Amino acid sequence: MQNCDPIKQKIKSLVKQLNKANYQYYNLSDPDLSDQQYDALIKELINLENHYPQFKLPYSPTLKIGGFVEKKFSTIKHKTPMMSLANVFNIEELKAFYDRIVKKIPTFSLLTELKIDGVAISLKYQKGILVRALTRGNGIWGEDVTKNAQTIKTIPLRLNEDLDLEVRGEIYLSHPDFEKLNAQRKQENKPLFSNPRNAASGTLRQLNSAVVAKRNLSIFVYGIADPYLTKPTQKETLVFLTALGFATNPHHYFVSNFENLLSVIEKYKSIKEQLTYDTDGIVIKINELVFHSLIGATAKAPRWATAYKFATITSQSIIQNIIFQVGRTGVITPVCEIMPVMVDGSLVSKVFLHNYDYICKKDIRIKDHVIVHKAGSVIPEILEVIKSKRTDLQKPTLMIEKCPSCKTILEKQPGGIDYFCLNPNCREQKIQKLIHFVSKNAMDINVLGEQTIITFFDKNLITKPSDLYLLKNHQHILQEISGFGAKKITNILDAIEASKQKGFEDVLFALGIKHIGKKVSQVLAKYFQTIENLQQSTSDTITQIREIGIKIAQSIQQYFSNSCNLEEVTKLKKLGVSFQSTNSQKPTTQNIFTNKKIVLTGTLQKYSRLQIQQILEQMGAIITNSLSLKTNYLIVGINAGSKLTKAQKLQIPIIEEKELQQIIENNQIKS
């Protein structure tokens, strides 16, 4: 007879591990397992329980729908349980799901929707007015977060019809808002959120609704909990929800057969990287709601729907070294050098580690085996340290005491998490400031690469930005440098001269004032018009601008109170650099874009998104991100997305790049 005791212990161990993971994920917003790890473990537990039902525990996570509920908010029972979805991870499992339906219902259709990687929520309306918002909680009981939900801009407080209904949706944080939130937290020396989902979860469970209001959460609503209010199909339900005033995700497709479903999956994979929010799969539902009750549900999930999960692209590597770099503001950033490895289509050899606290939290060590992925499909990140492969070779990483460049003792602000080199003459800081000044989003002097900057710096030709505009006086020295012929020198000097015509917002960003990113520099330039106006402004005046906070205002004041900075700005002005705003100037002549609302989609061949935006604004256009009946034109490039389809339905005029170029040339706009 088989000894079942090891199996019983394995089930018990899995239940304990998964219950802990559920609590970490749902209650603390700090998961200790990746999605793929969790999915693999829950699948293993289900398999064991199916084969050995006598060992199934009464508190098994396979019987639950979510996590536990904390007592910070009042808990209320859901009118209809908030069920989660079963997952499939490959085409074979998806085909098995499809075939099970075919056995019961020979003729049916499917509707596919994006699986938003966020926080599930239930919204209750009485006579069209929002009266309650509950988190999923444990699926039966949820936390009352009504006050927080009322601050979310995409949640209507009143519907377009006076209905009593309950809807379900997913709260999420877009990539731009996530980056903005983490940038703000870094300025405030607070721990960074690891991903948008954790940020959305942590935000929704804030006790102070004012904090929630500032973080710009969004929602996509996908269903109605009241059976008597649903429409005949899921597709019609989404149309109905949109008509009521809810935000619904536009990426849903009608599917008539399995072959059609496979082609739709490929379509989703192609658009995934273009999205401004996280998604980890596709929700596939029987479109005809009348069949839902016929197919039924398990104790945990409906049988009429499933989630096809996208594979997380990861790679394993080994940490070869951890070095510390000093940036242009003096902040010290640890960088992990790993054995080069392909991750999601590109070779990765370096991974930034944010700060020393981040290293300690993840216990990252030299010679560790690690799993690397791309956060937001863009930035390489250490997803996990494989501690089971550790030997005596891996020792805890220690923080350096001195600047890696100038050897000045590092300082850490009280209560802060970053270390700084405060030496104004630090070589590396000066070089990084010059590299920033000539960068694409600043003065855009693209012929001056990093190595050229270092060469000129070491020759004592440039130590500050104004020196760039004096290089023309040192051509005899430039000619003596190996690799710098007459043509190359001419190209460099011409590019430097041309940069004098850059707008105030570009020059302001190029100055490298602490906390002044590209977007903030545009806002400030538009408001103050000139460097003199900004220089003479008070903190109170600056903070009157909606997008600007006290940290930025203080940073501006500190910058202009420094005599060296004032001297540098004065010198740049005397050398011909423009500190006059061009962004807010009215077009000299009327054109078809004057005062027109324009939306951009796809990739243009001649212009970057920022360049074409600046050109259109110079022509008097108003650039918006979302299409509506108020949109005057849609400009399309290569790989235009769903906006093109929507514009065609709304009969919005569409302008392609060739026609756009002709309009720009006819109006003699410099590109």
From Swiss-Prot:
All copies of domain BRCT, residue ranges: 588-671
Residues at the active site: 115 (n6-amp-lysine intermediate)
Taxonomic source organism: Aster yellows witches'-broom phytoplasma (strain AYWB)
Entry binding sites for NAD(+): 35-39, 84-85, 113, 136, 170, 285, 309
Keyword set includes 4Fe-4S: no
The protein's name in its UniProt record: DNA ligase
Keyword set, alphabetical order: DNA damage, DNA repair, DNA replication, Ligase, Magnesium, Manganese, Metal-binding, NAD, Zinc
Functional note: DNA ligase that catalyzes the formation of phosphodiester linkages between 5'-phosphoryl and 3'-hydroxyl groups in double-stranded DNA using NAD as a coenzyme and as the energy source for the reaction. It is essential for DNA replication and repair of damaged DNA.
EC number: 6.5.1.2
PANTHER family noted in UniProt: CHROMOSOME TRANSMISSION FIDELITY FACTOR 18, DNA LIGASE
List of residues binding Zn(2+): 403, 406, 421, 426
